[in-house]
UniProtKB/Swiss-Prot annotation:
Entry coiled-coil feature ranges: none
N6-(pyridoxal phosphate)lysine modification, residue list: 99
Record-given protein name: Biosynthetic arginine decarboxylase
A Pfam family matched in the record: Arg_decarb_HB
Length: 628
């Protein structure tokens, strides 16, 4: 491609549309990261090289904690602007639900941004124990999820220790436990109630909101809870109203509709006498993983300002209309805070090129399928391309059937494939996406005629949402972007599972079934970046084939450059085997017995013993040495 340029690289991989200013391409063709507005752009390949020099191996998760602070600041600024525009005096708190990424480096970095404008959310006892320590004195803690007596007691202890804990009632039975424990500890509880909205935000996570939601009270249950609480000494403790419209809401109209309904609950509960001081709108703020700026499930058609305005405006109008004190607005936008800050870097271990196809020499005893395919190939420049491909598909299938029935041998079977792929390449060269009738065939050919890039990582461990819910993540080679990619490829991982593949790729502000990639150069590592993986992926990842956590580094960027602030070694084989119940001493003893029984020379026995020990204590992933 003679017209290739850095701008063409940016466009091909849709970088300006999903990167939100944090990632770009420099003149050397490297992906660069700019975590802070006034900081330098740092070469991602150089960061990876420095991490490897310090002992890290690929696959490698690279975290930029400065981006976390930037994301939080942008969210707070958007609500400050919206509240100013709507003359709203209630204030705003950005709560981080640590389920999104509980790692200390993530939750701790966000929690270090002290102030009334930040809080934490827990959905389980272990998470609660973490946030009780992470929270600033007097900090806001929202306690969600299913609760037993111990969970409630711990939350109330937090209240007694000066933290602003709110226990959100999500099941009617929880209120009785809260009242009993509050009296036992002699502490006034901070209570919230989660409502089930009828409004439903469309998307992959839509059942986290609406009538089918796992959590929350119905209108009748909300009324019954208030009637029960009203007759106790804690009637003025119901201070937080919580609801959830969904996660990764793509369409801003869904947010507006949900807020319209939720505001009615705020007005009605206030009219009944509840002292609602906080309205927690939950999560929902999406990320444009695709860069398509659309209502697609992995995209969004709005920005931060629009999101904030659609939350502030209904509450501002309701408070003015009904003479109510504006409540503090709380959001739980963990995805928006964390997604951008982490990038997974993995090396290509091998490439299986798509069949090129060739025309074999003719033979007198050729089966009918081969003769027909040869005739089609001879007419590639004469007859309509789509018609030729359809005929080729028919005779290719006929040949496969004949082989399965034992009517032709392996040599003929191979020649059938050779001819079919030669035809496929010839047909693709004649088709154009500008012709509507060509598009279905082009789509099929682009899926067939692609290389397989086997990448040293596990889909199930590092990007599990790709497998679980067909989530889309931007994927970009982190170097050589000043060169035109010569191939199209799909990415397969190292697991022994056919689901360990990426099937959808971000390209040219759209989605495709393959990705432009480069030919590998002998002696060079070809490294690919998986972007926007900072939310949920680490926590949801599993250990399929016993591939464990990857190595990880935290990179801090300032005006003088960057430094690797923290390095964490990934899981080793012995750790994974111990996790699934293997006794390491027994394994070592068994290896030793088998070496002894093999009657090897002392030198060879020592060599094999050392190799087995290295395998047992080594990284669970493949070597990251360059190919060739």
């Amino acid at each position: 491609m003679s017209d290739w340029s850095l701008d063409q690289a940016r466009k091909t991989y849709s970088i300006p549309h999903w990167a939100d200013g944090y990632f770009d391409v420099n003149a050397a063709g490297h992906v660069v990261v700019t975590p802070t507005a006034d900081g330098p752009a740092v070469s991602l390949p150089e960061v990876v090289d420095a991490a490897r020099a310090a002992g890290a191996k690929l696959p490698l998760l690279v975290r930029f904690p400065d981006i976390l602070g930037q994301r939080l600041g942008k969210l707070q600024a958007a609500f400050a602007q919206a509240q100013s525009e709507w003359d709203y005096a209630g204030g705003y708190t950005a709560v981080y639900p640590i389920k999104v990424n509980q790692h200390r480096g993530v939750a701790g970095t966000l929690a270090s941004h002290h102030g009334e404008g930040f809080g934490l959310e827990a959905g389980s006892k272990p998470e609660l124990m973490a946030v009780l320590a992470l929270s600033r004195p007097g900090g806001l803690i929202v306690c969600n999820g299913y609760k037993d007596r111990e969970y409630i007691r711990l939350a109330l202890i937090g209240r007694k220790l000066g933290l602003q804990t709110f226990i959100v009632i999500e099941k009617p039975s929880e209120l009785t436990l809260v009242l009993e424990e509050a009296r036992a500890l002699d502490v006034k509880p901070g209570l919230g109630v989660r409502m089930r909205l009828a409004s439903l935000g469309a998307g992959k996570w839509q059942n986290s909101g609406g009538d089918k939601a796992k959590f929350g009270l119905s209108p009748r249950q909300v009324l019954d809870l208030w009637k029960t609480l009203r007759d106790t000494e804690y009637a003025d403790s119901l201070n937080l109203l919580h609801f959830h419209m969904g996660s990764q809401i793509s369409n801003v109209r869904d947010i507006a509709n949900g807020m319209r309904e939720a505001t009615r609950y705020f007005v009605e509960l206030s009219r009944l006498g509840a002292k609602i001081s906080h309205v927690d709108v939950g999560g929902g703020l999406g990320i444009d993983y695709e860069g398509t700026r659309s209502r697609s499930y992995c995209s969004i058609n709005y920005g931060l300002h629009s999101y904030a305005s659609n939350i502030v405006q209904p509450l501002a109008s309701a408070c003015e209309e009904h003479g109510l004190t504006p409540p503090r607005i709380v959001t739980e936008c963990g995805r928006a805070m964390t997604a951008h800050h982490a990038v997974l870097i993995a090396n290509v271990s091998e490439v299986e090129q798509a069949p090129e196809g060739r025309v074999p020499d003719a033979h007198d005893d050729e089966p009918a399928a081969i003769r027909h395919l040869r005739e089609i190939h001879d007419e590639l420049d004469v007859r309509p391309a789509v018609e030729l491909f359809q005929e080729a598909q028919h005779f290719h299938a006929e040949g496969l059937s004949a082989y399965a029935l034992g009517q032709i041998d392996l040599t003929h079977r191979a020649r059938i494939d050779d001819l079919f792929y030669a035809i496929a390449h010839g047909v693709r060269a004649r088709l154009s996406f500008d012709e509507k009738s060509h598009r279905p065939v082009l789509d099929e050919l682009n899926e067939r005629l692609v290389d397989k890039y086997f990448v040293n990582f596990s889909v199930f461990e590092s990007i599990p949402d790709v497998w679980a819910i067909d989530q889309v993540f931007p994927i970009v080679p982190i170097e050589r972007l000043n060169e035109a990619p010569q191939r199209r490829g799909i990415i397969a991982d190292m697991t022994c599972d056919s689901d360990g593949m990426v099937k959808t790729y971000v390209e040219n502000e759209s989605l495709d079934s393959s990705l432009p990639l480069h030919r590998l150069n002998a002696g060079e590592s070809y490294r690919i970046g998986f972007f926007l993986v900072g939310a949920y992926q680490e926590i949801l990842g599993d250990i399929h084939n016993l591939f464990g956590d990857t190595d990880a580094v935290e990179v801090v960027v300032d005006r003088d450059g960057y430094r690797i602030a923290q390095q964490r070694r990934g899981d080793t084989t012995d750790v994974m085997l111990d996790y699934v119940g293997y006794q390491l001493d027994t394994l070592r003893a068994t290896y030793a017995e088998r070496i002894a029984a093999a009657h090897l020379s002392p030198e060879r026995a020592q060599e094999l013993s050392a190799a087995l020990e290295a395998g047992l204590t080594g990284y669970t992933y493949l070597s990251d040495e360059p190919l060739g």
